[in-house]
């Protein structure tokens, strides 16, 4: 007798605003490959899309992406990881979370969406996300 595997089967419906977010992020990276000036790239992107957020003139190349609660942030950033890998070959990403429950939820989402993204990106080099969890002090 073989025991049945307890697998989760989800139907994922990608929302237009999630695709817009992913496309925006990918386009910022596309422009970064063409220009050296990070602030110039972000300012042009902001003006093109008529966004209302401040651009800090800094040497650090940081992008803070925010979405409302319940909008599918985790799914969106996982898909963004695959898209950045597909378009630019990026392989290493750091995901920072503020608490243990959110970390555990993120790990669960990465596991639950594994088969979905494996099928969507079947022809890509990297089809799975390998994770390593760093906890302060270890």
What are these regions (language model features)?
Residues 1-138:
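RecA-like P-loop NTPase motor core of helicase/translocase proteins
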């Amino acid at each position: 007798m073989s025991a049945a595997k307890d697998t989760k089967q989800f139907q994922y419906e990608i929302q237009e605003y999630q695709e817009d977010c992913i496309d925006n992020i990918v386009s910022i990276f596309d422009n970064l490959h063409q220009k050296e000036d990070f602030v110039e790239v972000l300012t042009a992107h902001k003006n093109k899309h008529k966004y209302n957020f401040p651009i800090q003139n800094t040497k650090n190349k940081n992008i803070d992406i925010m979405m409302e609660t319940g909008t599918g942030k985790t799914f969106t950033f996982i898909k963004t990881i695959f898209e950045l890998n597909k378009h630019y070959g990026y392989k290493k990403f750091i995901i920072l979370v503020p608490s243990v429950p959110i970390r555990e939820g993120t790990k669960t989402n990465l596991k639950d969406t594994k088969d979905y993204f494996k099928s969507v990106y079947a022809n890509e080099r990297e089809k799975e996300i390998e994770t390593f969890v760093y906890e302060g002090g270890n």
